[in-house]
Amino acid sequence: MKFRNLFFAAVAGSAVAAPLAKEQKKRDSVFQWIGANESGAEFGENNLPGVWGTDYIFPDVSAITTLIDKGMNIFRIQFKMERLVPDSMTGAYDEAYLQNLTTVVNAVTDAGVHAILDPHNYGRFNGEIMSTPSDFQTFWKNLAGQFQSNSLVIFDTNNEYHDMDQELVLNLNQAAIDGIREAGATEQYIFVEGNSYTGAWTWTDVNDNMKNLEDPQDKIVYQMHQYLDSDGSGTSETCVSGTIGQERVTSATQWLKDNKKVGIIGEFAGGNNDQCKTAVKGMLDYLAENTDVWKGALWWAAGPWWGDYMYSLEPPNGVAFTGMLDVLQAYLG
């Protein structure tokens, strides 16, 4: 969970055709992946489909380049399914929206780093819980087909399922996996997410059945999110304590080990203050001590419309870019 606010800034450039498999950029970091979410194309979710440049925006490629130069090697690119396929989950694409999304993805992978496609829909489509796994499988077969030749693309099944039947969450994730592989996208990682906003601190209580997911390519990564404020929602600059980061990922770490799985913290953040800096460092240090199961983490969030949002990692003036990057720097490549 996280708070979202809208501000205006520049957009990414025009699209080009999806590239062939890219060479991965070489780097030196304790983690396989460390990076940021790139927010904007999911904004204005109460005004769908909305107007590009008014209700939503695409990430600024030059800002992403700055973060790559700082050592980041993975970017989770948010979008709304209703804008990509406005008629139905199995329907035709809005070609302009797809083109803009593809432009950002290509810019990231052309730099030799990973781009995550994140349908930021919370397990819903047009406000209704997605209850038909076969339609979701078709959605993912179609979308993965657009990027199946690009090995640096990662498919994130859906952002933060919540308040849903647990078996349905499992089945939707499995349907996504099946659709992606059916499309011929066999080299790419798939990030799966759980119920209860995919929280690491509630994972073992809520999402134990997710261990039953199957992928013929064995490239599933369990994506969890973790914020450090009192309710774990990511809506406050305050962190509970300097140790709360490590505390909230400990049980999930053991679950990954017990079930021989690997995971990533797909969203995390803390306020620009000493206690949160200590808590963030403590969590990342703990993840770094357990890289057999934790493959990295992504900050929430960069994006051109964040303005003075408390967690903004957008160069050059984002609150976290100027105030938290020194903490993150130790883990960057």
Curated annotation (Swiss-Prot):
Q: Which residues form the signal peptide?
A: 1-17
Cite the entry's keywords alphabetically: Carbohydrate metabolism, Cellulose degradation, Glycoprotein, Glycosidase, Hydrolase, Polysaccharide degradation, Secreted, Signal
Gene Ontology MF, one: cellulase activity
Query: Pfam family of this protein, just one?
Result: Cellulase
What is one GO cellular-component annotation here?
A: extracellular region
Q: Does the entry feature the keyword Signal, yes or no?
A: yes
UniProt catalytic activity = Endohydrolysis of (1->4)-beta-D-glucosidic linkages in cellulose, lichenin and cereal beta-D-glucans
Q: Which residues form a coiled coil?
A: none
| Entry annotation: catalytic residues | E160, E267
One Gene Ontology term of the biological-process aspect is:
cellulose catabolic process
EC number(s) on file = 3.2.1.4
UniProt KW Hydrolase keyword:
yes
Tell me where on the tree of life, at the top rank, the source sits. Answer: Eukaryota
Question: What is the protein named?
Answer: Probable endo-beta-1,4-glucanase B
Lineage in the entry? Eukaryota, Fungi, Dikarya, Ascomycota, Pezizomycotina
